[in-house]
């Protein structure tokens, strides 16, 4: 990667100037040979294995540092590589991190430089496994900052010394030997080094997080207590030994129980001297040091207190001399100490009044726990006092403005037995992981904003859901459940643990949580961790019992009283903060602090468990690579721009790739450098999506693009050949796809449609025993099965299928409802999703978990276990499924496609019996048959039913022996086109339909809506007995019915919209005389209104404006009615043919201007009772309304003429009213007398007035006209292009 020089931060910068002194690249023979890649974002293949291989190669070469962008990866070498000397440190001063090899000094230099250059707070987050080198990295950063901010002032030097002295002091009190690390930090630490206006360290601040105080009283085998106990017991002076009774560590239970008092690589005596020196540098007085060691002695002697049983089985002190000496060290009364250890005081309350006080004796186990609690409390408070005392010393100088923070915190822990300490540690790591991703993206965005780069925010897994699972209060998280359990059973730890286990049942629906008897699992970002419930509530209390508090408050030692301040009002009813509350507060404060600083990151890796400088354990390192999420970090970095370079450097590197910039290896371009960059990118055919040009830099998105540029010189023509091959393959694939579509159409013509055949099979299964809904009999109704598209890759159905854990092929899927019964309550109809696979039937429910929608399987039914399905003989949609040998109640479900569901079940299991009768029988409880009755009720919703008290009330449906209607002929919509390459279909906008449709042509698209909704109008005149909703339209135009919610019949197949009137929509199949050709009748327009001029478009032109039709007498009020019209009775030849055979008639004389209302007035052509929604506007036939807005979905926003009410109505139910203009219009002389039809209609020039009058004279003329119209229609369809097959594929 080329070098990037720093520049002054500016929002905008002028374009790069012309550069003419570009030199040829030269080979640096003195550079160390690079092994692997120094930045993991340049790896060709991103996987955990490839990252591990690269780290191994560099480790074996002595290169322990690697970058991921600005993140540093450090592998512990377990040896001195000589890379931390002053000479090495000097080479990194003032150098960009890309100018020198990866190093922790480069991170420190970048932090210090950014602090000075941008005056922004800096921080470094160091994370990794225990023993991976986190503390060492923190030391090196402090070493570099102290050296880089050199000053000759004594006060500044003293602050530097104190900052460096915090390391040995806090290591002694906060680190211990573990199985994995001889100097493992057992607490989190955030050190802020604060700088004055001259960027010199003038102050500091240390924040402590979660000391592992449990280690004070017990360790596992071959581990040790905190270092200070061994340092003090081995190196204490004679004065301390005489005054405090200090013995060797083998004499104390707390330091010898684990069997490890000495470590080969640790010199406790030397470390003790370093600790004393650090205390002196920080400024601890001798008196303060004496008190610290006094309490350390007391803690060691407390561990030697043992108990034995008395005659009553209670605990008593085995050796009172030890308690006497402990009382001497703590300066408390010995009798009170003994009483506090073996007894517990309990006080009862009666409301707001105090009750009786009892002294309850403890057994040996309880007394031992009290003893350990006292020792842990003293050490924890002592450690916090030391941190506070260090902070007091570090605040010596004023004037601190900016800071550099160093976070050294424990890593993610997964042990065989994990308890409260591990969940706290892992919770903090979850918070750090969250801020790591957020701040990484933030820094990326800032650079893109500086260079004015457009980019899309990176999508990544946000572990906020896991953090909320642990820390949330509403709904309660795990810590909140712990607090509630403690409050419920405060005195009894076992009872509190049981209460906590019960509360964990609340989290079972969370996908990141699992409950396993006495354990629970949290799915952290770094892996699943199993936690033990036992003992968690007791550790969460983090509170001394009342007797110990009174004991410590009675001390005469002022220092002990200082570290145990008065707890306040003892009678307060407020719950004291628990350990969980403290860690949540500390973690959130840490996140706030880090969010206010510019972050840097160091991820440390431990190469082996043997601490050998030569071993590299691939399996162990691979585990850490996954644990630290390095692959995710690389992908986040690469999701933005993996490579960025200044224009000059980019041109210098790649000018050979453009013939306009080079000739025979020489740079020949004389223009602007930015133009040269554009030429290179253009001539190399780099997609514009793969790069962006900023103010001074070019950004390459992926490393593969960069590598392609590097290899383009040799492979340019190969790439061009590949593009030609790719285009040819695309052409061949298009031909194959076209052939497949033709073959599919031919197969359907020969063998029929399998979906329609399945529908017919389903109708036979019903056997005429059940009343049918009108929508079930439509010709376009076919059994497609997977209505939710569960088998597709990206769809809502696929999402539900994935969440439900279904891997099989889906045969049938639909949304519906299921009856949910509760004891003592009315049954509820809950929305459900039904999915049928070849082996199981799933009923899936959805719930909100942490404000996120999730799906879960409520029922999983083996298809082979279904004995029968039960239905009523009415038109309702309820189905009862009887399952044998089931421990759950049988499901009673409601779905519009019940017949199709039963058909698929019957196909999968032929033994299933279909019971149809007046009742539905199913098992409401296992082994208990329950019957649901059905009855006719005309007050039921038109499109649904009413379920109440085990009774289904529904309207009368179609007879069960009704035959299925024939499928209408399929044709392409006149305003629809299909893009061959993309398959995108443009259905057009309703406003455009008026401009492009021919006024004389009744398109077949008027006879049915979108096939997905299944609402069609039959072409068979004998099947049409009643009027249908008439869509509104302009003069001389026809509108296609809306695609969505055009009528109530459409809504019948939409489970989410139940608007409309079923009776009106179903009436469209009865009266043949009402609508002879199934086309929407056109409302007659007054002659005084001008005809809108259609927009020019290719293809046939619409005919001229027609004149008034002849008739017996003029109509006083021309109103649109669903009746037989003269216009619809006349055969209409094709517009092109008509243009060739006869000239158009002359237009009528221009009408005088007429007053027009401010908003169009429409009239209801049919009754629209609505579905009960407050957003709908129920109408009666003949009601007049204003229409303020029409939506493409098929709904119009209507308003009463007096403005008293407003709501939505189906556009197909209303027609534009002419009565509103009747008083404003003036009579206009027509060019021909009116006929006797009673309705004045406009003719678009396709037929003569005489032909129209003759057609209206007799009923036989109507039949002949209809036949001629159908014949003309069929003739036109034969001449249409082959694209009609595309629309046929979209039908039911």
Curated annotation (Swiss-Prot):
Residues 403-485 are annotated as: Actin-binding. Residues 956-991, 1017-1180, 1227-1258 are annotated as: Disordered. The modification Phosphoserine is found at residue 356. GO terms for biological process: actin cortical patch assembly; actin cortical patch localization; actin filament organization; endocytosis; mitotic cytokinesis. It holds the Pfam family SH3_1. Residues 770-960 form the TH1 domain. Phosphorylation of the TEDS site (Ser-356) is required for the polarization of the actin cytoskeleton. Phosphorylation probably activates the myosin-I ATPase activity. GO terms for cellular component: actin cortical patch; actin cytoskeleton; cell cortex of cell tip; cell tip; cytoplasm; mating projection tip; medial cortex; myosin I complex. Residues 1062-1081 have a biased composition (Polar residues). InterPro entries: Fungal_myosin-I_SH3, Kinesin_motor_dom_sf, Myosin_head_motor_dom-like, Myosin_TH1, MYSc_Myo1, P-loop_NTPase, SH3-like_dom_sf, SH3_domain. Residues 35-714 form the Myosin motor domain. PANTHER family: MYOSIN (PTHR13140), MYOSIN-3-RELATED (PTHR13140:SF837). Belongs to the TRAFAC class myosin-kinesin ATPase superfamily. Myosin family. This is Myosin-1. It comes from Eremothecium gossypii (strain ATCC 10895 / CBS 109.51 / FGSC 9923 / NRRL Y-1056). The lineage of its organism: Eukaryota, Fungi, Dikarya, Ascomycota, Saccharomycotina. The gene is MYO1.
